[in-house]
Amino acid sequence: MKRVLFFLLMIFVSFGVIADCEIQAKDHDCFTIFAKGTIFSAFPVLNNKAMWRWYQNEDIGEYYWQTELGTCKNNKFTPSGARLLIRVGSLRLNENHAIKGTLQELINTAEKTAFLGDRFRSYIRAGIYQKKSSDPVQLLAVLDNSIMVKYFKDEKPTYARMTAHLPNKNESYECLIKIQHELIRSEEK
């Protein structure tokens, strides 16, 4: 009888684990927020170096930070085709020689685009944010094209898979998080 109860308990516990996606990767504070007419994604910068180097090898995605929107069911993330992408890289190093600079200079060089499948594209903004010098540095991706935001929201995503891919694998990570919905003060009545 004890074995049967143990077996049933394990099934229920396992079923509960399968029902939810992983919310946050260990030691990473990623988040994606939907506000009226805007989508924000924040990626922690694990190693904010004084000097960054890019165009070091032929790789179109030498650096990229990507937010994919979608849903999660039975511990499986299903992308909706909506994504924000900040990417630096080149397949033509003879045209793009190695560069070094600050993180902000690297971000200024990056392609910054929102995609909804192959149907729609829009420019996004990106920047560095750090409230206090003791706080970790965050890379922000901001889509504020209200028409694109509406299309993204129409897909009814509930989760975001956020990937930071850097040449140093110790600085790369992936977070799977529940999307937060917030009101900005100007939206409150």
UniProtKB/Swiss-Prot annotation:
- Keywords attached to this entry: Signal
Question: Where would one find the signal peptide in this protein?
Answer: 1-19
Name the source organism.
Escherichia coli (strain K12)
Output this protein's name: Uncharacterized protein YbfC
Instruction: Tell me the name of the encoding gene.
Output: ybfC
* Signal found in the keyword field: yes
